Swiss-Prot record:
GO terms for biological process: translation. Belongs to the universal ribosomal protein uS8 family. One of the primary rRNA binding proteins, it binds directly to 16S rRNA central domain where it helps coordinate assembly of the platform of the 30S subunit. GO terms for cellular component: ribonucleoprotein complex; ribosome. This is Small ribosomal subunit protein uS8. Gene3D superfamilies: 3.30.1370.30, 3.30.1490.10. HAMAP family: Ribosomal_uS8_B. It comes from the Bacteria. Keywords: Ribonucleoprotein, Ribosomal protein, RNA-binding, rRNA-binding. NCBIfam families: PRK00136.1.
Length: 130
């Protein structure tokens, strides 16, 4: 059986690895997952990521901890295959009053909520991270 929501699988793998105190986690790679990982790295939620392999690329995500506890408290899918959620730039919600980040898929790529508001572009709300 094929996987329907690969981004939700990525978030679940990250969540499970952090609960198990893993240093890194391997995820089947795709361009969308790579773009999400770039936003997570830019926002300081992960230490880094690397894509290896040609036929079946694998992305290794290095997780980040602060004083022994995971930096990512919550990572949850917002828009899903059964219920897509689109918002304009002004309607994009703030996560934890600006302390968290909403990852948005726009026509200019996958970016953070702050970058989307600054560029005044809306899009599909992929996930919220705090």
């Amino acid at each position: 059986m094929s996987m329907q929501d690969t981004l939700a699988d990525m978030f679940t793998r990250i969540r499970n690895a952090q609960m198990a105190k893993k240093v890194q986690v391997e995820i089947p790679a795709s361009k969308a997952k790579e773009a999400v990982a770039k936003v997570l790295k830019d926002e300081g939620y992960i230490a880094g990521y690397e894509v290896t392999g040609d036929k079946k690329p694998v992305m290794t995500v290095e997780l980040k901890y602060y004083e022994g506890s995971p930096v990512i408290e919550k990572i949850a899918r917002v828009s899903r295959p059964g219920l897509r959620v689109y918002k304009s730039a002004g309607e994009i919600p703030k996560v934890k009053d600006g302390l968290g980040v909403m990852i948005v898929s726009t026509n200019q790529g996958i970016i953070s909520d702050r970058a989307a508001r600054k560029a005044n572009i809306g899009g599909e709300l992929i996930c919220e991270v705090s």
